[in-house]
């Protein structure tokens, strides 16, 4: 799948704009606060129905406007498709070829996307919920059953927590059983995903042969000698029962997939404590590349790969590696404050953004 064009109306600092994209590299440069990141955000909102910059989409409406409208035209299997989203103070309306999309579950996965941005530092220094979100978004784009199971799990969790708060334990076992069955699928999916990402990350991380990079998945439900859905169901049943007294005191559920986490490790030491800032940034870029390859392996199609402000935190050597890999990653968008130093691949397109005006920039660095 390739995105042919992006249209924006009343989105951030864009009153109205339409951009035709290359199916390969799209390099977007310009000074700070001109609207480069807003273009990536628009694509992210269209793909996932949410922003990576705010939890309230209405905050992206241009000052003085009552709504924003975004539309992308895509090509898949030789056919053209349109995906649009309209947001105002009353809510949002999403259309796919003029047919309403009523839930985000329907939307997620239609246009797979991977974003590398400064907020990725939360995967190292943020809370467990930041890292669970990373896995949830990745798996939801690849596995329809995962996103539905995740939704049902959270509904069951809310019901159980409500009963715990009101000390109504007579029907608790019904929700315990649902959490155990649903939770086991989530945990096993996350564990398997981390193992596959580990293989991809290690192949991509060629900075030093002596460095071993891995994602250490942390779950009290995983027992290495009993790694199956059935064993995880049984373990979660036991933990829900044994933690009941504590859960009643807390008024919430203290065990389960909603407590899981992962740690990025280098040579079996936490990256958060034993790596330089440059090393951390490089590792996060590699993790996002691995995410692209993971989605490609599942869907047999490359996701849209967006990299924001690539010259912030990455050295020229790592940027060169990213640019060299870009042709194998499908459609890519990079933003920066200046032109690339490296030669871009054939059919790349360079855009200059100045005060929300986007123009094609011709430059000799394209082969």
Curated annotation (Swiss-Prot):
Keyword DNA damage set for record: yes
Pfam family, one: SMC_N
Annotated PROSITE patterns: RECF_1 (PS00617), RECF_2 (PS00618)
One GO cellular component term noted in the UniProt record for this chain: cytoplasm
The protein's role, per its UniProt record: The RecF protein is involved in DNA metabolism; it is required for DNA replication and normal SOS inducibility. RecF binds preferentially to single-stranded, linear DNA. It also seems to bind ATP.
Protein family membership: Belongs to the RecF family.
Name under which the protein is recorded: DNA replication and repair protein RecF
